[in-house]
Design a protein with these regions (language model features):
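Polytopic transmembrane helical bundles with strong interfacial aromatic enrichment
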Residues: 1-492
Length: 492
């Protein structure tokens, strides 16, 4: 239980916990946001009661998820000031602009037009309601952009210089800082993963309906949308993931070496499985393609990349990265996280292919119980891939919280050990960590019960809002009714 006496480690665990919980809801919000927009577009074109019910259903699921995403996200930002005061002072001049933009532009865009989706169905035109659905999704994508801009600066700092006393990074060029070397590849890689999560969640819900024989028309429409959606995003992921890996190899060689457990320079193999023995600095029980990773990163099986020992001996990172530092790095954790992400992508690709083929081959998925069961559990694949990818990105950056990337100005970096709040003690962190666990457990159980209830109720065509909407359209009157009625048929 040595970690209970290490305040920096406890602060890292607490932040990781809040980020992991938050990252349950962010992928669903962005992924399901597009599902909402797609089904609202279908309703706008068809004006059918079935498509109206489908749109209402996805709006409810999205709203429950969005609310928890906001709550867990606020906690993360407050922890910068409570547990990571030195870090907050160091990056404050850089992070102020993107975090303010995220709140003022993206969050307000999402919130305002989500209000339209919830309460404006009978009060605005169908076209305005449709535009609102797309703006909610656009707002969520913009929110992800500003957060990734901030995080990417930590990975490859640019457009900044150190203050005279070395305690603060000062912004010198906003565009250089915002669009640093890793912003674009990391943004497309991340958002595409979140869209895959949304597609698989929709696929799972539809597959459950097919298995139970419920709402079969809605389920088949959803399966068709989700399988095409998943196929497109999965194919794009091949491109985005490749570019992201190439960028890591160029900009963060220590992380790249940890991802493949490379201590010494070599043409890096592509491991299917393996275990890094950190004491002997070897990958044991490996199944690998020799030079496979080198080929993916450079196009040649013979390209050699430096290992951790080579990087320490080069002196490129000074006293921050030595042989002693290497002995303390969680290399196996990064190795396993990275390869879990890759393995999950393999399952994503297989599930996507099967769902697409058997959906468009006379709708055979409707009678294939084994494929329905696979689809029901399939959201676990992108979820684990997303969490494992986040672990790889953040733990692989160690021992720095602001990485001294190859393209960054000399000296703009910050060690994790120098980032935490000195006044926060280990007992305080341990107690608040336990409280966070209990509160988040309560929240996620509550969210799960709400979503499960919504799924059991399903898309209801004969809602109170339908009849009242039709009457209102004919008479020119409009009553507020309950929440269900307020998200009834658009364009009244």
């Amino acid at each position: 239980m040595e970690f209970l006496t290490d305040p920096v480690l406890l602060a890292r665990i607490q932040f990781a916990l809040t980020a992991m919980y938050h990252y349950v809801f962010v992928p669903l919000s962005i992924g399901l946001g597009l599902i909402v927009a797609i089904f609202e577009t279908k309703y706008y074109r068809s004006q059918s009661v079935e498509d109206a019910a489908a749109s209402r259903f996805w709006i409810k699921v999205f709203t429950a998820t969005f609310a928890l995403g906001v709550a867990t996200g606020i906690t993360m930002e407050f922890s910068f000031g409570t547990n990571w005061a030195d870090y907050a002072r160091f990056v404050g001049d850089i992070f102020g602009a993107p975090l303010a933009a995220e709140a003022l532009l993206a969050f307000f865009l999402e919130s305002v037009f989500l209000g339209v989706l919830l309460f404006g169905r009978k009060k605005v035109s169908g076209k305005f309601y449709l535009v609102s659905a797309w703006l909610v999704w656009l707002g969520s994508c913009l929110s992800a952009l500003w957060i990734i801009i901030a995080n990417s600066w930590m990975q490859t700092p640019a457009g900044a210089e150190l203050s005279a006393d070395g305690t603060q990074a000062l912004l010198t060029n906003f565009l250089d800082a915002a669009f640093n070397a890793t912003t674009a590849p990391r943004y497309f890689h991340t958002v595409d993963a979140l869209l895959i999560m949304g597609a698989f969640t929709a696929l799972a819900i539809a597959a459950w309906y097919l298995k139970k024989g419920l709402h079969t028309e809605f389920a088949m429409k959803t399966v068709r949308v989700a399988s095409v959606f998943a196929l497109c995003t999965t194919c794009l992921m091949v491109v985005f993931a490749h570019q992201s890996a190439v960028t890591v190899a160029e900009e963060q060689p220590t992380k790249f070496a940890m991802m493949e457990g490379a201590y010494n320079g070599e043409a890096m193999p592509l491991y299917a499985v393996g275990w890094v023995d950190e004491a002997s600095q070897k990958v044991i029980t490996p199944i690998a393609i020799p030079g496979g990773t080198s080929f993916l990163a450079s196009g040649s099986f013979d390209t050699e990349y430096p290992g951790l020992n080579d990087l320490a001996k080069s002196g490129a990172y000074g006293s921050d990265f030595t042989e002693e530092t290497i002995s303390e790095l969680p290399v196996n954790t990064v190795f396993q996280s990275y390869h879990l992400m890759v393995a999950m992508f393999g399952l994503i690709g297989l599930t996507t292919l099967l769902a697409f083929i058997f959906t468009f081959r006379k709708g055979r998925i409707a009678s294939m119980r084994w494929l329905q069961n696979l689809a029901i559990v399939s959201p676990l694949f992108p979820f684990l891939a997303i969490e494992a990818g986040w672990f790889t990105a953040e733990i692989g950056r160690q021992p720095w919280v602001v990485y001294p990337a190859t393209s960054s100005p000399e000296g703009v970096s910050l060690l994790t050990q120098a980032s935490s709040s000195a006044s926060v003690t280990s007992p305080e962190l341990a107690i608040t960590l336990a409280l966070f666990l209990l509160i988040y457990l309560f929240l996620i159980i509550g969210w799960a019960r709400i979503v499960i209830h919504l799924i059991k109720v399903g898309p209801r065509i004969d809602e109170s809002g339908e009849a009242s909407n039709e009457t209102a359209r004919k008479t020119g009157n409009s009553s507020n009714g309950n929440v269900e009625a307020s998200i009834g048929k658009a364009g009244e």
